[in-house]
Amino acid sequence: MKINIHRGAKEIGGSCVELESQGQRILIDLGLPLDAEKNDVIYLPDIPGLDGKDPSLLGILISHPHVDHFGLLAHISPDIPIGFGPAARRILKAAAPFMPGKWQAPENGWNYESEIPFEIGPFT
């Protein structure tokens, strides 16, 4: 397994970690840096597949509903599955009208429950 910390190791906020195994990848979080002046595509890490055209990116797991963990989802393909805890998905749907731009809580993806294993490709 390869682990690539794109952002969040030497800063608070903007978390984004990529896991790769057997040629398949998932991201844990895709957050907006706390020092970002606005939510802009310029903060999107250079990760293959965020345009939805690389099938090796299986999805993005969001750890919790803080903007520094999910804030850049507005700049990726809506075809990428997004994993949330059920409460986080409800919170983000409720918050969507107050988010900048035309941000909508992602519908594509899966829910996960605390302490219940789930599989995404080679990841458990």
Task: Cite the ranges covered by each PLM segment.
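Catalytic core of the metallo-beta-lactamase
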Residues: 1-6, 12, 16-21, 116-124
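Hydrophobic alpha-helical bundles that form the membrane domains of multi-pass transporters
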Residues: 64-72, 120-123
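Short beta->alpha connector loops
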Residues: 8-11, 65-67
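Divalent metal-coordination and catalytic microenvironments
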Residues: 3, 19, 29, 64-65
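A generic "binding-loop/recognition-motif" signal
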Residues: 66, 88, 114
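Short acidic-hydrophobic, aromatic-tinged amphipathic segments that line or gate anion-handling sites
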Residues: 106-117
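Pre-active-site segment of Zn-dependent metallo-hydrolases
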Residues: 11-14, 22-62, 74-75, 79, ...
